[in-house]
């Protein structure tokens, strides 16, 4: 039984997403269907949480919109997500960045991670 479930999960999993971590700024392109119309909406912000797993893997992105903090949680293997772009790589020392909810302005900045390769 477990082999069948694993095989179904492998078929449903997406492999085209980039490698990103908490602290990275990402732009998530989401396909939205309203009635008969279909459009792509962009949600750009900082990844504050990454929940690992197989099919139930998810991540939370936070942005400030008109002075109000907005957080959205996305399933990693969601078929409605067109693509995920990594804008900048952030350098943080925590895996859950919930403390950013209390910070405003310059205090909420995240240092950029240098890529040494």
Curated annotation (Swiss-Prot):
GO terms for biological process: translation. Keywords: Ribonucleoprotein, Ribosomal protein. GO terms for cellular component: cytosolic large ribosomal subunit. InterPro entries: Ribosomal_bL19, Ribosomal_bL19_CS, Ribosomal_bL19_sf, Translation_prot_SH3-like_sf. It comes from the Bacteria. PROSITE patterns: RIBOSOMAL_L19. GO terms for molecular function: structural constituent of ribosome. NCBIfam families: rplS_bact (TIGR01024). This protein is located at the 30S-50S ribosomal subunit interface and may play a role in the structure and function of the aminoacyl-tRNA binding site. PANTHER family: LARGE RIBOSOMAL SUBUNIT PROTEIN BL19M (PTHR15680:SF9), RIBOSOMAL PROTEIN L19 (PTHR15680). Belongs to the bacterial ribosomal protein bL19 family. This is Large ribosomal subunit protein bL19. The gene is rplS.
């Amino acid at each position: 039984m477990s082999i069948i479930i694993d095989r179904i999960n492998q078929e449903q999993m997406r492999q085209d997403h980039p490698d990103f971590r908490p602290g990275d700024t990402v732009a998530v392109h989401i396909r939205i269907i309203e009635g008969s119309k279909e459009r792509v909406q962009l949600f750009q912000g900082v990844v504050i949480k990454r929940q690992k797993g197989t099919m139930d893997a998810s991540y939370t992105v936070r942005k400030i919109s008109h002075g109000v903090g907005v957080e959205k949680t996305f399933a990693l293997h969601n078929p409605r997500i067109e693509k995920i772009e990594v804008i900048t790589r952030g350098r943080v020392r925590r895996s859950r960045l919930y403390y950013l909810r209390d910070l405003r302005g310059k205090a909420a900045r995240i240092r950029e991670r240098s890529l040494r390769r």
